[in-house]
C-alpha cells in the first residue's frame, strides 16, 4: 500500500511532495498495530488523493492547444525547447533581442505539461517588465489577466488560486525563499534577463544550484539575450543550452577609423557626438522611413547637458533634442514616446540600454562609456566612476536599433578598442557591499558563505567587508552568528543599515519618523531633477525644508503631502507634485513602502509612536545605521569623515550654507569628487552613545584632582579615525587602579594635596611643615625628607585599592585597619643620623626692644620673596636699624660677603683671590664686631689687604634675592603695608601711601 502511495505522490502538488514523502518514511519505520497503521494510511491516502485531484483540476485550466506566433524565432524552436525541458532539469536559452523568449517560454512550459502540479514562476528584474509580460502572455492565451496568468510585484498583484503562471520580480522570489526554502509551490522557475547579474539574480542562481540537488523534479530555465552560455552551463553541471536567433534587421557597425583616433582625442565627447549627429541628420534627411531617430549613449547627466548645449548651438533645422536619464521627471521622460515629425535626438544614459525601450530608433551613437557603481573597500564609499563598457553592453546598445528596419550603430572608439574590452560587465556581487546578501543567507541558514555556489565567487575581502558592516550594525556577534537584532533585521525588507535605524528608532520611541525616512531611502528619490537648471528662487522646496536636517525635510514633505492628500483628490495631488517638482508615481510608491514597512515592523513586535519625537532621538537612530557616514568640517566647505574620507555637501542640501561642525550623511557618492546629497547636524556626543561598541578610547594624562579628591585622567574618544571627543575627564581608577593608587600617593598625599580632617593627616602636615621650614632655612629642599620618602611611607601603610580621599577616609574608619598607628610620621626618625637642624644660624625670630620679631623663610629661586623676610609691626619700625636686619640671619653672612666681594671691580677682586678664603679669614672678627655690614666689610678690607673701598660701593652691588633680607611692615591684623630691602626704603613706601609711622 505504501509503495502504491509513493507512486501516487508523483502526481500530487509539489508543495505537498516533501510532506507526504516524510509521512510514508515514518510509517515504514514505525511498528504499529494493524488498526492504527490502517487508520494513518487511510488518512494519508485521503490527503494524497485531494492533492492529486487539485493537479487534475489544474490541468483542465490549461488550454489544450497553445498557439506560438510564427513571426517569433523562438516559436520555431518551441518543440525543441519543450522536449529538452522534459529531459533536463536545467535549460539555458540564449535568445537574441526580439526572439520572443520572454513571452513564449512560459507558454512552452504549459505546453510541456508543467504548471499542473505547481506554478511556473517567471522572474523579471523590473516591475514594469513583470506586469507587461504577464498581460501579454495572458492575452496570447486568450485569458484575462489574473486567471491563468498573473503577476506579483512590490505592493501590487493580480493573482488568483487558478493562476498557473506567475510573473514576478526577483525580489518577490527572494522574499518567498524566506518562508518556503524549497520553493515547493513551484514546478518551474524561469530566470529572465540573467545577463544583468544583479545581486538578486546572482543569489537566486546560487540558491537554485543548491536546490536542484534536493528537488530533482524542479525545472529551471535561465534565459537572456547577451549571456555567457558556457559559464552558465558549467555552473549548472553542464546544463543544456539552446540558442535562438533574434528577429532583428541588419545593423551596420561603424567604428572610429584608426587614422582619426589621435585627431579625435583632442575633441570633447560632446563635440564628437555633435559631429556624428549632424552627419547622421544629413543621412536621415535623404531617405523616408518609419525609423529615423538617433539614440546617443552618454555616461552622465552632466555629459547630456553639455552635449545638448553644443547641439543647440548648431541651430540645426528640424532637430528635436530630448534628454533621458533616471532622475528626469516622468513627464519629460514620456516625451520620447510621443508622435513627432522632426528628426529626434535622444541623449541618454545607460537607462535606455535595458530599462526603457525607445521607439523608432534608426541610429545609435555609442560613446562606449558609462557610470558603473563600484564599492571601494578602502574608503567604504559607493563610487560611480566613468568606465569603458563591456562588449556585451556595447552589443546591447547596438540592439536598440534595427528593430523595425535596417539600423546603423556608430561607435566613437576604434574596433581594436572594442576587441580589447571585457566580454561582460562585472556582476554586481563583485562590486558592491555584500552585507545584505550575507544577512539573508545567515537568516536562511545556508551555511558558510565562502562555500556558497555563486556564479562568480566574491573575493574573501568582499565577504569579510560585508561581515564587518553587519558587526558594526550589531547584526552578528564575534563568531559571525546572527544576534537577536540581526534576526529581526533580516525580516525587514530593506538595506541592513536602514533596518538597524528602525530597530534603534523603536527603542527611542521615534519609529514613525524613521519609517518615513527609511521608506524614502529605499526607493528612488521622488524629488525630481529637471533637464533645465533651476534658479534658487524658482525652487519651492523651502515649504518643507528643515534648517538643520535633510532627513527632517523628508518628514516635513511627508506631512505636507499627507495633508494635501486628505484635503483633495488625485488631480489636486498631481498638481501639488508638479508645483514642487515631485514625481507623483514615486510619492505613491513612498507611501506604499511606508505602509508595508509599518506592517512588517508591527508583525515583529515593534511599536509605532503616536506622539512626535525629538530631533536628538531621530538622528541618533539615523546614526545607528550610518556609523561610517559621520564627519566634521575641516575647512570652509570640506568635511572629513571616517577613515579620512574628504567630501563636500551638495548645494541641494539644506546644510549647503549652514555647514555645521558635525554631520551625519546619507550614502557618499564618488564621481569626479566625493559628495553627500543628504546630511544633518548632530552632536558628537550622540556618536559615542550609539557607537559605544565601536569607539576606541585613549586615556591619557592621569593626575590628582584637588577638586574631586580623586585620580582623574583625560579620555579621547575615536571612531574610525575621527576624534569625536577630544578631552573628557574620567575616573582613572576604573582604567588602571594600580597606577591610580601610585598617583594618589605621589601627587595627593606626598604633595600634601589631600583635603581631609583625618587626625593622622593633620599631625603629619604639622611635622612636614616644620621640617620644610628647616629645609627652607638651609635652602636645601628634601634634605631631611623627600617626596619619595613620604610616598614610600604611605605606600607601605595604605592598601593598593585606595585611590581617593573618600576611599582613604572609609578605610581609616574601619577599626580593623589599624590606620591610626600606621599612618603617623616619626619626626626624629626622618632625620639622617638623628641630625636635628640647627636654628642658631637661621633663627625663627629676632629680638627688638623686648619684642620677638618673626622671620619667615621661603625657598623659591627666581622669586622676589625668595629667602628670609622679617615681619615687623608698624609701631616698631622706628626702632629697627639696617644693622639689625644685616645680622638677623647669621647663616647667610658668609655667602653674602662672598657675593659682595665678587661684585667689586676685577682689579680689586684679583687682590682678594681666593675670595672665599679671604671671607673665612675675616668672618669670626665680623661676628665679634657686628654693626653695619657694608662699613664693617670696608674696614676689614683696609685692615687685612690695604684695599680702600667706600661702603656705598657695596650698596650698588646686585645680590641674589635670597641674600637680601626683606622687611615686611604689617599692621595689627598682620596685613602687609610695605615691603623693602632696607629700613629707609620701607619708610619711604609707607610715606608714599600716607601711613603714619612716626608715633
Task: Kindly label every feature range from the protein language model.
Residues 600-633, 652, 690-692, 699-703, ...:
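A positional "C-terminalness" feature that preferentially activates on distal terminal regions of long
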Residues 93, 478-479, 649, 879-882:
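Extended hydrophobic-aromatic, low-complexity segments
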Residues 4-7, 290, 310, 317-318, ...:
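Second RecA-like catalytic domain
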Residues 249, 647, 853-855:
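Short, isolated positions in well-ordered beta-strands
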Residues 80, 100, 104, 128, ...:
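Generic recognition of stable, solvent-exposed alpha-helical segments in well-folded globular domains
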Residues 180-195, 367-375, 379-380, 384, ...:
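Extended active-site and interfacial segments that coordinate phosphate-rich ligands
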Amino acid at each position: 500500500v505504501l509503495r502504491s502511495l509513493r507512486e501516487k505522490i508523483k502526481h500530487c502538488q509539489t508543495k505537498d511532495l516533501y510532506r507526504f514523502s516524510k509521512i510514508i518514511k515514518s510509517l515504514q519505520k514505525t511498528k504499529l498495530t494493524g488498526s492504527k497503521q490502517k487508520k494513518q494510511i487511510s488518512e494519508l491516502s485521503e490527503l494524497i488523493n485531494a492533492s492529486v485531484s487539485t493537479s487534475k483540476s489544474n490541468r483542465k485550466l490549461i488550454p489544450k492547444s497553445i498557439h506560438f506566433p510564427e513571426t517569433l524565432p523562438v516559436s520555431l524552436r518551441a518543440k525543441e525547447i519543450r522536449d529538452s525541458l522534459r529531459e533536463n532539469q536545467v535549460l539555458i536559452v540564449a535568445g537574441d533581442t526580439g526572439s520572443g523568449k520572454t513571452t513564449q517560454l512560459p507558454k512552452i512550459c504549459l505546453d510541456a505539461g508543467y504548471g499542473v502540479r505547481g506554478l511556473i514562476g517567471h522572474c523579471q528584474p523590473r516591475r514594469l517588465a513583470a506586469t507587461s509580460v504577464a498581460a501579454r502572455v495572458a492575452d496570447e492565451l486568450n485569458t484575462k489577466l489574473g486567471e491563468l496568468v498573473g503577476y506579483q510585484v512590490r505592493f501590487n498583484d493580480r493573482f488568483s488560486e487558478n493562476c498557473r503562471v506567475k510573473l514576478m520580480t526577483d525580489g518577490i522570489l527572494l522574499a518567498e525563499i524566506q518562508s518556503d526554502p524549497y520553493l515547493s509551490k513551484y514546478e518551474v522557475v524561469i530566470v529572465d534577463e540573467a545577463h544583468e547579474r544583479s545581486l538578486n539574480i546572482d543569489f537566486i542562481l546560487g540558491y537554485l544550484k543548491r536546490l536542484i540537488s534536493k528537488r530533482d523534479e524542479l525545472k529551471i530555465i535561465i534565459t537572456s539575450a547577451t549571456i555567457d552560455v558556457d559559464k552558465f552551463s558549467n555552473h549548472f553541471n553542464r546544463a543544456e543550452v539552446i540558442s535562438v536567433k533574434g528577429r532583428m534587421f541588419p545593423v551596420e557597425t561603424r567604428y572610429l577609423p584608426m587614422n582619426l583616433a589621435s585627431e579625435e582625442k583632442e575633441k570633447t565627447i560632446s563635440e564628437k557626438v555633435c559631429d556624428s549627429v549632424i552627419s547622421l541628420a544629413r543621412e536621415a534627411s535623404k531617405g523616408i522611413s518609419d525609423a529615423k531617430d538617433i539614440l546617443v549613449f552618454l555616461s552622465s547627466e552632466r555629459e547630456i547637458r553639455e552635449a545638448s548645449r553644443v547641439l543647440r548651438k548648431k541651430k540645426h533645422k528640424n532637430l528635436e533634442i530630448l534628454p533621458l536619464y533616471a532622475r528626469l521627471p516622468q513627464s519629460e521622460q514620456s516625451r520620447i514616446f510621443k508622435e513627432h515629425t522632426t528628426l529626434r535626438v535622444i541623449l541618454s544614459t545607460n537607462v535606455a540600454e535595458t530599462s526603457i525601450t525607445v521607439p523608432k530608433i534608426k541610429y545609435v551613437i555609442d560613446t562606449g562609456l558609462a557610470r558603473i557603481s563600484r564599492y571601494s573597500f578602502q574608503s567604504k564609499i559607493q563610487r560611480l566612476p566613468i568606465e569603458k563598457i563591456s562588449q556585451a553592453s556595447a552589443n546591447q546598445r547596438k540592439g536598440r536599433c534595427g528593430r523595425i528596419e535596417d539600423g546603423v550603430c556608430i561607435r566613437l572608439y576604434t574596433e581594436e578598442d572594442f576587441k580589447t574590452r571585457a566580454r561582460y560587465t562585472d556582476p554586481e556581487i563583485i562590486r558592491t557591499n555584500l552585507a545584505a546578501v550575507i544577512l539573508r543567507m545567515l537568516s536562511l541558514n545556508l551555511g558558510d558563505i565562502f562555500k556558497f555556489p555563486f556564479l562568480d565567487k566574491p573575493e574573501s575581502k568582499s565577504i569579510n567587508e560585508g561581515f564587518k558592516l553587519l558587526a558594526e550594525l550589531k547584526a552578528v556577534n564575534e563568531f559571525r552568528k546572527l544576534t537577536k537584532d540581526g534576526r529581526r533585521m533580516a525580516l525587514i525588507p530593506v538595506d541592513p543599515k536602514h533596518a538597524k535605524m528602525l530597530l534603534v528608532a523603536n527603542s527611542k520611541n521615534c519609529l514613525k519618523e524613521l519609517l518615513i525616512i527609511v521608506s524614502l531611502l529605499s526607493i528612488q528619490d521622488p524629488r525630481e531633477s529637471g533637464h533645465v537648471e533651476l534658479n534658487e528662487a524658482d525652487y519651492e522646496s523651502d515649504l518643507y525644508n528643515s534648517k538643520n536636517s535633510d532627513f527632517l525635510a523628508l518628514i516635513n514633505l511627508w506631512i505636507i503631502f499627507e495633508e494635501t492628500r486628505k484635503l483633495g483628490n488625485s488631480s489636486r495631488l498631481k498638481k501639488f507634485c508638479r508645483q514642487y517638482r515631485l514625481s507623483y508615481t514615486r510619492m505613491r510608491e513612498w507611501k506604499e513602502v511606508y505602509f508595508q514597512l509599518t506592517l512588517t515592523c508591527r508583525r515583529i513586535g515593534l511599536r509605532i509612536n503616536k506622539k512626535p519625537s525629538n530631533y536628538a532621538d531621530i538622528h541618533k537612530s539615523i546614526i545607528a545605521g550610518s556609523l561610517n557616514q559621520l564627519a566634521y568640517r575641516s575647512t570652509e566647505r570640506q568635511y572629513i569623515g571616517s577613515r579620512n574620507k574628504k567630501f563636500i555637501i551638495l548645494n541641494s542640501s539644506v546644510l549647503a550654507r549652514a555647514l555645521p561642525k558635525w554631520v551625519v550623511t546619507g550614502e557618499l557618492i564618488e564621481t569626479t569628487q566625493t559628495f553627500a546629497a543628504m546630511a544633518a547636524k548632530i552632536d558628537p556626543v550622540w556618536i559615542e552613545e550609539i557607537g559605544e561598541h565601536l569607539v576606541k578610547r585613549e586615556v591619557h594624562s592621569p593626575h590628582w584632582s584637588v577638586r574631586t579628591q580623586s585620580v582623574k585622567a583625560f579620555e579621547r574618544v575615536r571612531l574610525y579615525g575621527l576624534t569625536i571627543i577630544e578631552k573628557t575627564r574620567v575616573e582613572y581608577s576604573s582604567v588602571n587602579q594600580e597606577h591610580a593608587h601610585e598617583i594618589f600617593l605621589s601627587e595627593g598625599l606626598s604633595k600634601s594635596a589631600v583635603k581631609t580632617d583625618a587626625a593622622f593627616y593633620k599631625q603629619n602636615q604639622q611635622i612636614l611643615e616644620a621640617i620644610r621650614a628647616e629645609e627652607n632655612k638651609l635652602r636645601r629642599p628634601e634634605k631631611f625628607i623627600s617626596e619619595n620618602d613620604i610616598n614610600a611611607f604611605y605606600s607601605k601603610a595604605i592598601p593598593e585599592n585606595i585611590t581617593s580621599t573618600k576611599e582613604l577616609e572609609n578605610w581609616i574608619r574601619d577599626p580593623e585597619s589599624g590606620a591610626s598607628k600606621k599612618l603617623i610620621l616619626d619626626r626624629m626618625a626622618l632625620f639622617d643620623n638623628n641630625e636635628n637642624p640647627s636654628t642658631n644660624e637661621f633663627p625663627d625670630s629676632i629680638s627688638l626692644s623686648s619684642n620677638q620679631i618673626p622671620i619667615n623663610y621661603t625657598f623659591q629661586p627666581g622669586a622676589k620673596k625668595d629667602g628670609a623676610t622679617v615681619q615687623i609691626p608698624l609701631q616698631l619700625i622706628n626702632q629697627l636699624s639696617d644693622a639689625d636686619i644685616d645680622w638677623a640671619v647669621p647663616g647667610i653672612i658668609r655667602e653674602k660677603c662672598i657675593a659682595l666681594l665678587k661684585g667689586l671691580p676685577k682689579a680689586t677682586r684679583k687682590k682678594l683671590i681666593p675670595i672665599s678664603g679671604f671671607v673665612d679669614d675675616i668672618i669670626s672678627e665680623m661676628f665679634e664686631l657686628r654693626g653695619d655690614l657694608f662699613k664693617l666689610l670696608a674696614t676689614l678690607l683696609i685692615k687685612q689687604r690695604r684695599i680702600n673701598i667706600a661702603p656705598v660701593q657695596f650698596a650698588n652691588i646686585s645680590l641674589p634675592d635670597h641674600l637680601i633680607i626683606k622687611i615686611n611692615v604689617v599692621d595689627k591684623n598682620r596685613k602687609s603695608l610695605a615691603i623693602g630691602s632696607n629700613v629707609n626704603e620701607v619708610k619711604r613706601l609707607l610715606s608714599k601711601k600716607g601711613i603714619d609711622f612716626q608715633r
